[in-house]
Amino acid sequence: MLTITFGTAGVRAALRLLEATLDPTPLNEQTTTINRTASGVEWLDPVFQIISSGALFAWGGLALFLLLRHLPAPMDWRLRAKDWLHGAGLAAIIGLPGLAFYFSAVHLGLSRNVAPSGLADNPAQLPLLVLNSWANGFAEELVVVAWLATRLRQLRWGWPAVFAASSLLRGSYHLYQGYSAGVGNIVMGIIYLWYFKKTGRIWPLVIGHGLIDTVAFVGYAVWF
């Protein structure tokens, strides 16, 4: 599962960070773009963007399928109204301090400048950014939290080891942004897994992640 999803992404991101570190240009003078233009042909670019988002939804869907098939006890998968409230709270807890941490890290030379969107300045691209935001949230939380934690517990891993594995995996595939992105996402991983362990609810995590990315991606596209 991890080989075809975020495990490989983590290795690739670590190598990207190594490449950026070896570059003579200081890390905080480099820029990395999250949502890049995928084609120079205007009408083809949205097609590529939708395919990329679809792949992420497929990753999350595979994790969901495996959970439904192999869970020893059924999990409550219903989406409740309070999930949106909890998700918004998680987004605020992670997003606001995370933004301050990012700017501090850039100032200290521990992060590249991150451009959340490199798509064309076109209002028609905004729905694609929203789609990708929620695709990220769905894939990451289903795979890195729900599936991975459940599978490791089935393999009799203790909770400290599960926390380490899940949070380090989340940090690894964000390393292409800089060292601070790895650390910040490890912290996010610990908080998100703690919530999942405490409540058994995954949708607030998906919602929180989707809201964070939507604000970052769409906000950047609108203001910059």
Enumerate the predicted regions with their spans:
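Generic alpha-helical structural signal
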Residues: 5, 9-12, 16, 133-134, ...
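Hydrophobic core of alpha-helical transmembrane segments in multi-pass integral membrane proteins
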Residues: 2-12, 53-67, 91-104
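Short helix-terminus and kink motifs of transmembrane alpha helices
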Residues: 8-20, 145-146, 150
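Structural signal for the C-terminal ends of transmembrane alpha-helices
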Residues: 64-74, 195-198
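Juxtamembrane helix-loop-helix connectors linking adjacent transmembrane helices
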Residues: 19-50, 68-136, 150, 154-155
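Transmembrane helix-loop-helix hairpins at the membrane interface
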Residues: 99, 103-224
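Small-residue packing motifs within transmembrane alpha-helices
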Residues: 3, 56-59, 83-87, 91, ...
